[in-house]
């Protein structure tokens, strides 16, 4: 179904949109059966209103931008449909399990997220739409099923910012707010963010059926993921081993991209890892400002398990958890009659796949860092040069984003042009020593300074979602002023462009930003 993009027809789009979202034939995950989910309506959200809307995601879903101005839009995406949901079209919450902070947590599930259906994308793919903050579900445990305005704005902005940085991610169509109070560390207001992704299947979905000794359901889930998202795995000698490899390699690529832009996820539990290798579950995330390899963005992470430098190791560990969950399926095609022999071979095969994570991650990060340094040619010492820069930045707490962006101003032959980036370092002599090494390396390049600068500015964003920028937008939104949410979203659509009229958004964080804390409370 294609929706009209004209403003005049936007009102007529809403009923068709609601019907299409609920079409049972299109909701592939639901067809897996009741063991995978629970269907239930969203909890009504009183007097909802639109806080933020992504034209880009609307275009992806072939929705007219004017649809957000229609009165029924906020109702629909608050989980307050204007018609009764028929039983076959009821939203659903899925069940999964997982490891949280390295400890087995048992059954978890969508405690405040409800998938309301899927829509065809203009890119030929199909996308599920999920309401985060839609109310209590059977998996809410002690939670109230709500999300707050603060965290919903952060997820909305960062989902779209990451996409425009070129990093695989779930998307966000809209944020719907309300004046309904919810209790967190203080009284806040409820909101709903509409997540958009090809799939919300996590490592934890596989762990759930493995831990419950349901190889039949585990296989059903794996077949669903393979057939819909990894069809090439079906032709492999062992489709389930191929699935593990594909997910492992995508995860390695993803985390390399995180590291390259200074992104910290904050809560890399196995239930927060996408089987598609995309960034999912934006909670206590953060972009590193003053660089610290041990930076912890999540105030709740007292052990530093998910610190910046730990992210590759944790991602690899999470892939081991996925491998364990898939072991009952690996090797089934080999026809080994003896269960112990099959299990032993499955372990060996899985370990061989998992060994590919560092083999994939290392070169991926090296390529990213080479691009950030403007090095078109590959040389043996490039990784050491990049690591030396990070060490120098760490020692001086130099700003991550500004340092890499300003490196483009360095000249092969003129050290006097170093000042903009040099001024970011406390230890100027240490920077000078590194800059001399860098200039020597640049002398091996064939591009001139101007061409290199253009390439570097395509690899090093000028604008990222710093915590203080999000905080300003959140504070204004609490006063019903959503202009800063819109302005920030527009700036972050073009993170690599100069945008001189928005120079203040690329500046060093103000002193008060140092007191900001984000945690798992959302």
Curated annotation (Swiss-Prot):
Catalytic activity: L-seryl-[protein] + ATP = 3-O-(5'-adenylyl)-L-seryl-[protein] + diphosphate; L-threonyl-[protein] + ATP = 3-O-(5'-adenylyl)-L-threonyl-[protein] + diphosphate; L-tyrosyl-[protein] + ATP = O-(5'-adenylyl)-L-tyrosyl-[protein] + diphosphate; L-histidyl-[protein] + UTP = N(tele)-(5'-uridylyl)-L-histidyl-[protein] + diphosphate
Coiled coil start-end: none
Binding site for Mg(2+): 272, 281
Keyword terms of this UniProt record: ATP-binding, Magnesium, Manganese, Metal-binding, Nucleotide-binding, Nucleotidyltransferase, Transferase
Cofactor field: Mg(2+); Mn(2+)
Cystine bridges: none
Domain of life: Bacteria
Active site (record annotation): 271
Residues the entry annotates as binding ATP: 109, 111-112, 132, 144-145, 195, 202, 281
Alphabetical list of InterPro entries matching this protein: SelO
A UniProt-annotated Pfam family: SelO
EC number: 2.7.7.-, 2.7.7.108
One Gene Ontology MF term: magnesium ion binding
Family per similarity comment: Belongs to the SELO family.
Role summary: Nucleotidyltransferase involved in the post-translational modification of proteins. It can catalyze the addition of adenosine monophosphate (AMP) or uridine monophosphate (UMP) to a protein, resulting in modifications known as AMPylation and UMPylation.
Protein name according to UniProt: Protein nucleotidyltransferase YdiU
Gene: ydiU
């Amino acid at each position: 179904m294609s929706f009209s993009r004209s403003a005049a027809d936007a009102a007529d789009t809403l009923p068709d949109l609601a019907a299409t979202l609920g079409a049972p034939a299109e909701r592939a995950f639901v067809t897996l059966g009741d063991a995978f989910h629970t269907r239930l309506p969203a909890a009504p959200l009183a007097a909802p209103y639109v806080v933020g809307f992504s034209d880009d995601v609307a275009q992806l879903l072939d929705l007219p931008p004017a649809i957000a101005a229609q009165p029924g839009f906020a109702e629909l995406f608050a989980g307050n449909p204007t018609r009764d949901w028929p039983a076959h079209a009821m939203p659903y919450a899925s069940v999964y399990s997982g490891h949280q902070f390295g400890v087995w947590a048992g059954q978890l599930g969508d405690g405040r997220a409800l998938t309301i259906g899927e829509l065809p994308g203009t890119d030929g793919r199909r996308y599920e739409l999920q309401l985060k903050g839609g109310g209590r579900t059977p998996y809410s445990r002690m939670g109230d099923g709500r999300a707050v305005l603060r965290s919903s704005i952060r997820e909305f902005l960062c989902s779209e910012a990451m996409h425009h940085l070129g990093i695989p991610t779930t998307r966000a169509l809209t944020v719907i707010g309300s004046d309904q109070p919810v209790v967190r560390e203080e009284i806040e207001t409820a909101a709903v963010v509409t997540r958009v992704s090809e799939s919300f299947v996590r490592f934890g979905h596989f762990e759930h059926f493995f831990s419950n000794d349901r190889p039949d359901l585990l296989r059903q889930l794996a077949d669903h993921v393979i057939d819909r998202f990894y069809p090439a795995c079906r032709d492999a000698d062992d489709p389930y081993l191929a699935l593990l490899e594909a997910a492992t390699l995508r995860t390695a690529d993803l985390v390399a991209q995180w590291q390259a832009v200074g992104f910290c996820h904050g809560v890399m539990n196995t239930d927060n890892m996408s089987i598609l290798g995309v960034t999912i579950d934006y909670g206590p995330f953060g972009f590193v400002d003053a660089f610290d390899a041990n930076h912890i963005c999540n105030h709740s992470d007292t052990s530093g398990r998910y610190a910046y430098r730990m992210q590759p190791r944790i991602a690899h560990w999470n892939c081991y958890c996925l491998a364990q969950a898939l072991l009952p399926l690996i090797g089934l095609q080999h026809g080994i009659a003896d269960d112990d022999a099959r299990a032993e071979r499955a372990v060996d095969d899985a370990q061989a796949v998992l060994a590919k994570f560092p083999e994939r991650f290392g070169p991926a990060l090296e390529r990213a860092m080479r691009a950030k340094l403007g090095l078109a040619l590959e040389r043996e010492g490039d990784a050491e040069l990049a690591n030396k820069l990070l060490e120098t930045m760490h020692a001086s707490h130099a700003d991550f984003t500004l340092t890499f962006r300003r490196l483009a101003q360095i000249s092969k032959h003129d050290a006097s042009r170093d000042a903009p980036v040099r001024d970011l370092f406390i230890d100027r002599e240490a920077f000078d020593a590194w800059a001399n090494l860098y200039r020597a390396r640049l002398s091996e390049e064939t591009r001139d300074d101007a061409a290199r600068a253009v390439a570097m500015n395509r690899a090093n964003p000028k604008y990222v979602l710093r915590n203080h920028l999000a905080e300003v937008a959140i504070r204004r939104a609490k006063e019903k002023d959503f202009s800063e949410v819109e302005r920030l979203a527009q700036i972050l659509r073009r993170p690599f462009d100069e945008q001189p009229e928005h120079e203040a958004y690329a500046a060093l964080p103000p002193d008060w930003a140092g007191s900001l804390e984000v945690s798992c409370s959302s």
